[in-house]
Amino acid sequence: MSSQIALPDGRTLSYAQAGADAGPVVTVLDGPCSRGLGWALAPTARELGIRLLIPDRPGIHGSAAKPGRTMADWPADQLALLDALDIERTGVVTQSGGTGYGVAVAASAPQRLTALALLGGLAPMTSREARMDAGKQLRTAVFLARKAPFVLKAGLRQTFKKLPDSAIAQVPAADRPFLDDPLIRDIHLRTMREFLGNPDAAIEEIRVLARPWGIAPPPAGVIPTALWTGELDEAHPPAHARQVAELLGGDPPVTVVPGVGTFGLSRVFPDVLRFAVGR
């Protein structure tokens, strides 16, 4: 279920809430067009008494589009949401394409964050090293979003028409066993429908990933920060998490979870959420 607020510039921002009804707050920033990480974290958050705030970036769900936006624009939107909901401080948990947005908030308003937890960290895709280390699907999408968005849009539409089979077929081998869990399967299919069903927003999100972040990371040690990544993650492998840690001064610990890709990071959700709220 979505709610909305009006932003100072007149745009709307939509968001969902999950987890516990009361308690410390964690803001969840997932990859392009996705609330999936928030839904996946929700059962653990309820058990731990943690509220989850899941905001939608511009052009997604009920959030009004903002053409030409960059990651550096996001903190103002997130801070406006926190103010509207009378939330003084929040932990931040990101995944994949949400990495840079979380770093941007940490850099802009460190006093509003309890901690920054980065799952499946994605380094800036502006360097050749980052592009080559990324999975083939992500690397191709970034290239097409920059050079031939019409080709990418056609591909997204074709994949959407072939759901759910196309979504299952694209799941890496390390993650496929987790689809036996009805919750994970449902979240994955719902997320893919949202991503593929809104190709214009999806392409804009990928374009943002293809550009420089446009932010100066927070000084090392200002905000407690940690990274978790799956040993077998194909889209954003451990090399990306290490690049992000280096970008953040080299101090944040990188935990490589053995034998799993992205979905298998669910085993560390309790640790991630506790870290995010400073427990």
Segment roles from a protein language model:
Residues 11-62:
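Conserved HGGG/HGGXW glycine-rich cap/lid loop of the alpha/beta-hydrolase fold
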Residues 212-222, 238:
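The feature captures the conserved acid-bearing segment of alpha/beta-hydrolase catalytic domains
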Residues 136-140, 146-216:
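Alpha/beta-hydrolase
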Residues 248-279:
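Catalytic active-site module of serine/aspartate enzymes centered on a nucleophile-bearing elbow/loop
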Residues 73-91:
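Conserved acidic catalytic loop of the alpha/beta-hydrolase fold
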Residues 89-132:
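Conserved hydrolase catalytic core segment
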Residues 221, 227-229:
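Short beta-strand/loop motif that positions the catalytic acidic residue
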Residues 234-240:
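Conserved alpha/beta-hydrolase "acid-adjacent" motif
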